Amino acid sequence: LECYQMSKVVTCKPEETFCYSDVFMPFRNHIVYTSGCSSYCRDGTGEKCCTTDRCNGARGG
Protein backbone atom coordinates (compact mmCIF):
# COMPACT_ATOMS: atom_id res chain seq x y z
CA LEU A 1 0.00 0.00 0.00
CA GLU A 2 1.55 3.25 -1.17
CA CYS A 3 0.07 6.58 -0.24
CA TYR A 4 1.33 9.91 -1.45
CA GLN A 5 0.98 12.17 1.53
CA MET A 6 2.60 15.47 2.41
CA SER A 7 5.11 15.34 -0.47
CA LYS A 8 6.34 11.91 0.51
CA VAL A 9 5.43 8.33 -0.14
CA VAL A 10 4.29 6.28 2.81
CA THR A 11 4.47 2.52 2.47
CA CYS A 12 2.34 0.36 4.72
CA LYS A 13 2.42 -3.33 5.40
CA PRO A 14 0.00 -5.45 3.34
CA GLU A 15 -2.27 -6.00 6.34
CA GLU A 16 -2.28 -2.34 7.28
CA THR A 17 -4.16 0.68 6.02
CA PHE A 18 -2.98 4.25 5.81
CA CYS A 19 -4.98 6.63 7.97
CA TYR A 20 -4.91 10.39 8.10
CA SER A 21 -6.91 12.70 10.30
CA ASP A 22 -7.32 16.32 11.27
CA VAL A 23 -7.01 16.83 15.01
CA PHE A 24 -7.99 20.17 16.51
CA MET A 25 -5.75 21.36 19.31
CA PRO A 26 -7.70 23.84 21.49
CA PHE A 27 -4.69 25.04 23.44
CA ARG A 28 -2.84 25.86 20.22
CA ASN A 29 -5.96 26.98 18.40
CA HIS A 30 -5.14 25.23 15.16
CA ILE A 31 -5.57 21.91 13.40
CA VAL A 32 -2.82 19.33 13.54
CA TYR A 33 -2.44 16.96 10.64
CA THR A 34 -1.66 13.43 11.69
CA SER A 35 -1.13 10.33 9.60
CA GLY A 36 0.25 6.84 9.81
CA CYS A 37 -0.18 3.16 9.13
CA SER A 38 -2.57 1.17 11.25
CA SER A 39 -4.03 -2.31 11.32
CA TYR A 40 -7.28 -0.75 12.48
CA CYS A 41 -8.85 2.40 11.15
CA ARG A 42 -12.29 3.92 11.29
CA ASP A 43 -13.91 6.40 8.95
CA GLY A 44 -15.06 8.98 11.42
CA THR A 45 -15.08 12.72 11.88
CA GLY A 46 -12.02 14.18 10.24
CA GLU A 47 -10.51 10.77 9.72
CA LYS A 48 -10.06 8.93 6.45
CA CYS A 49 -8.52 5.65 5.47
CA CYS A 50 -6.46 4.92 2.43
CA THR A 51 -7.37 1.49 1.11
CA THR A 52 -6.05 1.66 -2.44
CA ASP A 53 -2.55 1.97 -3.84
CA ARG A 54 -1.23 5.46 -4.49
CA CYS A 55 -4.18 7.27 -3.07
CA ASN A 56 -3.71 10.85 -2.05
CA GLY A 57 -4.62 11.80 1.49
CA ALA A 58 -3.06 15.24 1.40
CA ARG A 59 -5.44 18.14 1.06
CA GLY A 60 -4.52 21.56 -0.21
CA GLY A 61 -3.86 24.37 2.17
UniProtKB/Swiss-Prot annotation:
GO CC list: extracellular region
Keyword DNA repair: no
Subcellular location: Secreted
Pfam families attached to this UniProt entry: Toxin_cobra-type
UniProt keyword annotations, A-Z: Disulfide bond, Secreted, Toxin
Tissue-specific expression: Expressed by the venom gland.
Gene3D superfamilies according to UniProt: CD59
Source species, domain of life: Eukaryota
CDD domains: TFP_snake_toxin
Keyword Secreted included in the entry's annotation: yes
Cystine residue pairs: C3-C19, C12-C37, C41-C49, C50-C55
Molecular function per GO: toxin activity
Main subcellular localisation: secreted
Similarity comment: family membership: Belongs to the three-finger toxin family. Short-chain subfamily. Orphan group XX sub-subfamily.
The protein's name in its UniProt record: Weak toxin CM-2a
